[in-house]
Amino acid sequence: KNKTNKEIALRTLKFIVDRQIVKKDPTCDFSGLIVGTVGYLKAQFVFSKEWNNCVKVAGFYSANGEEYPPQVLDETGSCYIPEKALKKRSFKIQVFGKREGYFIPTNKIEITQDGGRI
């Protein structure tokens, strides 16, 4: 059975969420990102225990704060990065967790698509 791009991302950007701080996973290569990607990039988050039993949503923003469509994370802590976010040289990611009587946001982290420049 053939899989579509929506079923398989070819590249995953990995992040670590410790309490309210989101940061790039130091074992993940964030270099060589090219502006204009569609259906290729996913974000995946690993969470500390404060996030247990929360519905988790990733927020995506332009460098000047414009909000792109938020994405609910799946059971692996992953989501596709919205096409609109990937049209600019840089974008920001923030994560939110919610359960009854509980809400936890993170900081925003900026991702730069360096166009393959070294």
Locations of the language-model features?
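N-terminal assembly/attachment segments of tailed bacteriophage virion structural proteins
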Residues: 1-117
